Curated annotation (Swiss-Prot):
Top enzyme category: lyase
Role description: The alpha subunit is responsible for the aldol cleavage of indoleglycerol phosphate to indole and glyceraldehyde 3-phosphate.
Active site: E49 (proton acceptor), D60 (proton acceptor)
InterPro entries listed in its UniProt record: Aldolase_TIM, RibuloseP-bd_barrel, Trp_synthase_alpha_AS, Trp_synthase_suA
Protein name: Tryptophan synthase alpha chain
């Protein structure tokens, strides 16, 4: 059984929601990524998304774009990320998902990327810019390696939700807003209606992401979903420029505060 399915099953049995955290692999550096992942797990993260740095991340706001750029400036490449995941797997069995842009996979080689992801212990992929029309090739390879393609839906894509979710696995990443990622004060979309719409088309667990920056927001949204995704607010804390141990402490206390309300 895929680690993602197993995790949602356990959480359901405990009556809890998933806390899914996002960081950019290689920011501030690749070795620190290893420490951050273990700190996230220790603080209560249930699933971790590792962003593969990309020069033109269309779905991301300024925080994650800057983070991606810092990693690229350090010369972080896909093989470095694969190696660090392999190292993480010696210590941890937490579900790990790559958030990766299609062009990165395409340039690396679809089959090569998926085989290596499988070999190091990646459980799923989120590909924000994957056109539905191009999905078939990746889906076939991903299925072959037991890697889940996690669908992304947005409030604007009502008629496309069925199409987007029908071959997805793991969970549905429900974008809570239209636009790019980034920590926000409030989330305007009528979440309840939106989640009901998504539920009409799929029984997969649903996780809400984009813009969740505080435990209060997470608490407000948890009743409508099976999980909460937090990225920019976490990446901001990593970028603050504390020394490493202070940064890890800050990350842990933020993640613990989110976990408490879920």
């Amino acid at each position: 059984m895929n680690r993602i399915d197993k995790k949602f099953e356990v959480l359901k049995g405990e009556g809890r929601k998933a806390l899914i955290t996002f960081i950019t692999a290689g920011d501030p550096d690749i070795e620190t990524t290893y420490d951050i992942v273990l700190a996230l797990e220790e603080a209560g993260s249930d699933i971790i998304e590792l962003g593969i740095p990309y020069s033109d991340p269309l779905a991301d706001g300024p925080t994650i774009q800057a983070s991606s750029q810092r990693a690229l400036n350090k010369g972080v490449k896909i093989p470095d990320i694969m190696k660090i995941v392999e190292k993480i797997r010696l210590k941890s069995d937490i579900p790990l998902v790559y958030l990766v842009y299609y062009n990165s996979i395409f340039k690396y080689g679809i089959q090569k990327f998926l085989k290596e992801s499988k070999d190091v212990g990646i459980d799923g992929l989120i590909i924000p810019d994957l056109p539905i029309e191009e999905r078939k090739d990746i889906l076939e390879e991903a299925d072959k390696y037991g890697i889940y393609l996690i669908p992304l839906v947005a409030p604007t894509s009502k008629e496309r939700i069925k199409l987007i979710t029908e071959n997805g696995k793991g969970f549905v990443y429900c974008v809570s807003i239209t636009g790019v990622t980034g920590a926000r004060e409030d989330i305007e979309t009528d979440i309840e209606e939106y989640m009901k719409t998504v539920s009409q088309y799929t029984n997969m667990p649903k996780a809400i992401g984009f813009g969740i920056s505080t435990p209060e927001m997470a608490k407000k949204l948890k009743d409508f979903s099976d999980g909460i995704i937090v990225g920019s607010a976490l990446v901001e804390r990593i970028a603050k420029g504390y020394n490493k141990s202070e940064m890890l402490q800050e990350v842990k206390s933020f993640v613990s505060s989110l976990k408490e309300v879920l």
